[in-house]
Curated annotation (Swiss-Prot):
Organism of this sequence: Paramecium tetraurelia
Protein name: Cytochrome c oxidase subunit 2
UniProt remark on cofactor binding: Binds a dinuclear copper A center per subunit.
Positions of Cu cation A1 binding: H115, C150, C154, M161
PROSITE patterns for this protein: COX2, COX2_CUA
Protein's gene: COII
Matches recorded under Pfam families: COX2 (PF00116)
Length: 205
C-alpha cells in the first residue's frame, strides 16, 4: 500500500549580509512511499543539518511539515542564543547565601565610591554611601537564585558589577552555616583587612 504525498514548491530566502555571497545548499530528497508514518520525506543536507544564516534555499520540493519543523528549531535556537550570551553578564566570583522565611536586615556600607545594591526580583535597592550605613529589611519566601547589579554610575573603572544571591531553605542554611561559619565583622581602617574580614567572603562560596 502506497501513501501519496502532496508536494508544493517553496521559495525561502534568508536574510544575509552584503559581503556574503548567496549560495545554494545542496541537498538530496529521498521519498519513502512505502512508509506510512507522518514523515514520508527525509532530507539529507551535505552542509550543516539546520538552517544557517547568510544562506539561501530555493526551489525545494518536499513536505511542508518537515520545512516547518526545520524553521521552528532554527527559531528556537536563535531565541535562546541571546540568552546564552547574556549568561556571562550574570557570572560572579562569589554568591551570597541567605535563608528563606526569615526577616533579614541588610546593612550596607561602601569603602571607596557610591554603589547601589539592586535586585529587582526581591524589590531591593540600597544605596551604599561611604561613611554612612544604610539598612533595609526584606523577607524572601521563594528558594532559588536571584540576580542583580549595581544601579549606580560609580565612576571610572566601575562598571558591570553583577550580584548573585542564593536563597536556601532554613534547614539547609543551618547546615551550610555550620559548615562554613559566619564572617568576622571587623571594622578596620586597612583596605586589605577590610576586604578580607568585612567583605563577607566567608559568607559566600
Amino acid at each position: 500500500m502506497e501513501k501519496k504525498m502532496n508536494t508544493d514548491l517553496f521559495y525561502l530566502t534568508l536574510k544575509q549580509k552584503r559581503y556574503k555571497r548567496k549560495k545554494n545548499i545542496p541537498l538530496r530528497i529521498r521519498l519513502d512511499k512505502n512508509d506510512l508514518s507522518a514523515n514520508t520525506a527525509s532530507i539529507k543536507f551535505t552542509d550543516k543539518p539546520y538552517l544557517v544564516a547568510n544562506k539561501i534555499i530555493k526551489s525545494l520540493e518536499f513536505n511542508a511539515t518537515s520545512l516547518y519543523r526545520c524553521i521552528k528549531k532554527n527559531k528556537l535556537r536563535s531565541e535562546n542564543f541571546s540568552v546564552q550570551l547574556s549568561r556571562r553578564l550574570l557570572r560572579t566570583k562569589k554568591t551570597l547565601v541567605l535563608p528563606s522565611h526569615v526577616n533579614i536586615t541588610l546593612i550596607s556600607n561602601s569603602y571607596d565610591v557610591i554603589h547601589s545594591w539592586f535586585i529587582p526580583a526581591l524589590g531591593i535597592k540600597i544605596d551604599c554611601v561611604p561613611g554612612r550605613a544604610t539598612h533595609h529589611t526584606f523577607y524572601c519566601d521563594s528558594v532559588g537564585f536571584y540576580y542583580g547589579q549595581c544601579a549606580e554610575i560609580c565612576g571610572r573603572y566601575h562598571h558591570h558589577m553583577p550580584i548573585k544571591l542564593c536563597i536556601l531553605p532554613f534547614e539547609h542554611f543551618l547546615i551550610w552555616w555550620q559548615h562554613f561559619g559566619l564572617p568576622k565583622l571587623l571594622f578596620t581602617e586597612s583596605k586589605n583587612r577590610f576586604e578580607t574580614d568585612y567583605g563577607l567572603k566567608k559568607f559566600c562560596w
